[in-house]
Amino acid sequence: MKIKVGILGASGYAGNELVRILLNHPKVEISYLGSSSSVGQNYQDLYPNTLLNLCFENKNLDELELDLLFLATPHEFSAKLLNENLLKKMKIIDLSADFRLKNPKDYELWYKFTHPNQELLQNAVYGLCELYKEEIKKASLVANPGCYTTCSILSLYPLFKEKIIDFSSVIIDAKSGVSGAGRSAKVENLFCEVNENIKAYNLALHRHTPEIEEHLSYAAKKKITLQFTPHLVSMQRGILISAYANLKEDLQEQDIRDIYTKYYQNNKFIRLLPPQSLPQTRWVKSSNFADINFSVDQRTKRVIVLGAIDNLIKGAAGQAVQNMNLMFDFDEDEGLKFFANL
């Protein structure tokens, strides 16, 4: 028997990837597409590549008969929309940032709004499947992690958990394709602005910073602060992070490989690459995999960690489906058994 799901925000890039994946999921039926601006429009007219013969509607969510609702909506939307009564009727996976951070003050600092639903904020489960699998299985509301966040945390988590690095030395240099900026028209994202170009943005201000710090702090069991700098790269999709940290001990690469293997050997979507094989965005394109590798610089006593994901799949829609699979006791990789399209 298939579960019935609905999607708010299916017109965006992440929403479209969600539709594409769910159409190929054997245990899901998409029965509702919500929109306030595209009511009556058939989804196939908006995205001819996606054969979903379903029109957008604008119904009261309390009227819907759904098992699960995905929210791929702008920040601050779901914080105002969701309530306990709705969560008694259906499960929710929120792809926005509205329930990712536990401290309400972080929303005032980083997102410039006062969170109106602090009780739900505390009850939401952070949907990084490789770290919080058991909590996700029991959750009614899952906060799907950010794209930079997913790549950064997964790449560094074992080092923080084992406390083998100087936490204050961590620097993350991240690069993302243009789809990470969303589908809305912006001058800075026009073809002539981004083609044959790479640029940094939001220095010391990127909103994924507190998210990364929060969950690496949980791993380290102490509050940490790190440096995160994102860049926009002239490609459609993909994230590559390069992270640097000072080692506290004289460790060899095999020592660190043993640590990563300890944490990730049983995870279906994390690929610890062989020595000397460095992650590339094309190897994870359109897939739910996170590729990770590292090198130890014996001269500087630093570990250099590389991670790559597809920002729209493992960084958004694919991870949301992975969360859904856990919440409904499906195989974790159901509907996600595809490799990179080189």
From Swiss-Prot:
Keyword check for 4Fe-4S: no
Pathway the protein takes part in: Amino-acid biosynthesis; L-arginine biosynthesis; N(2)-acetyl-L-ornithine from L-glutamate: step 3/4
UniProt protein name: N-acetyl-gamma-glutamyl-phosphate reductase
Single GO MF descriptor: NADP+ binding
Source species of the chain: Campylobacter jejuni subsp. jejuni serotype O:23/36 (strain 81-176)
HAMAP family: ArgC_type1
Gene (UniProt): argC
Classification via SMART domains: Semialdhyde_dh (SM00859)
Upper lineage: Bacteria, Pseudomonadati, Campylobacterota, Epsilonproteobacteria, Campylobacterales
Main location: cytoplasm
EC numbers, comma separated: 1.2.1.38
PROSITE patterns: ARGC (PS01224)
GO cellular component: a single term: cytoplasm
Keyword Oxidoreductase tagged: yes
